[in-house]
Amino acid sequence: MASDLLCCPGGTDRFDHERTGPGPAAVSTEQFVWGRMKSAVPLGAPRD
């Protein structure tokens, strides 16, 4: 599902031709990658 959001510019609804992008509140690819890296830290491990 997350891959659909990253690959499809309009989000998961591929048939909505009026939208041209994910919108102003969407997470950029860089923010998404950093968020995934931080979530991969095991519970109980020290974080930044």
From Swiss-Prot:
Purpose of the protein: Probable antitoxin component of a type II toxin-antitoxin (TA) system. The probable cognate antitoxin is PhoAT; the toxin gene can be expressed in the absence of the antitoxin gene in M.smegmatis strain mc(2)155.
Record keyword Cytoplasm present: no
Source organism of this protein record: Mycolicibacterium smegmatis (strain ATCC 700084 / mc(2)155) (Mycobacterium smegmatis)
Signal sequence coordinates: none
Membership in a protein family: Belongs to the PhoAT antitoxin family.
Keyword Transferase: no
Highest taxon of source: Bacteria
Induction: Part of the phoAT-phoH2 operon.
Disrupted gene: phenotype observed: Deletion of the phoAT-phoH2 genes has no visible growth phenotype.
Keywords in alphabetical order: Toxin-antitoxin system
Protein name as catalogued: Probable antitoxin PhoAT
Cystine residue pairs: none
